[in-house]
Amino acid sequence: MTSSSCPRASLNYRPAMKASDVDPDAEYAVPLEHFDVEVSPYTVFERGGTCVRVSGRRLACLLRNGSRGESAPAPAAAAASAGQPGRKRSCKNVCFKGATSRRELERTLTARVNLPPCMTGLLRQFEIRNRGDRYRKRFVFNCYLINTTTCTACDRRCFVNAAAVLYERDEKCVREMMSLLRREDCYKPPNCSKMSQESLCFKSGACRGTNPLCNF
């Protein structure tokens, strides 16, 4: 499920909040990057998939136990990193906030990025199943996505929603994307030769260069 059906609106979580500031009887919309929150099929996403709905009692417990995301950047640091030369300037600006299905996600992506056949092939395989001999394929696609696209509107928070849509809100798959997003320098996908050895590349005349990143 992608949004709450509860009529009561969630309160906004503030990074400066302490456990004593939390109303235990309220519900809060908490950005995923602020806490190491376990995502499950029952997790309620809000704000276009950038936040999860958390009860006040659980939020107070998270604050008391120091369960904040270790790699979550401060707002000022995030804004500064967005303007660093070479980090995002060469990426295509894409926002996945409105994507609610795999087809919508793919249309949003391909409208801005010229996907090489190997990445299109991975998308087709994810339609069949997300898990079961798919970890390496998810890793390669996630790395490609992070290295070729960015979102200046929400500093890539919508990428968590993209992973939730693409991988059918599978907890493990979504956390893999979150882990890569927290890295200062994300891994790059393997070169075309390595992709071919792993049966991830089927060589097309439409490709250029020696790495999938050359084709966007």
From Swiss-Prot:
Matches recorded under InterPro entries: Lef-2 (IPR004283)
Recorded superkingdom: Viruses
Family per record: Belongs to the baculoviridae LEF-2 family.
Gene: LEF-2
The protein's role, per its UniProt record: Required for late and very late gene expression. Specifically required for expression from the vp39 and polh promoters.
Composition bias type Low complexity, residue spans: 71-82
Name of the protein in question: Late expression factor 2
Organism this protein belongs to: Lymantria dispar multicapsid nuclear polyhedrosis virus
Record-level GO BP terms: viral genome replication; viral transcription
Keyword Transcription: yes
Region (Disordered): 67-88
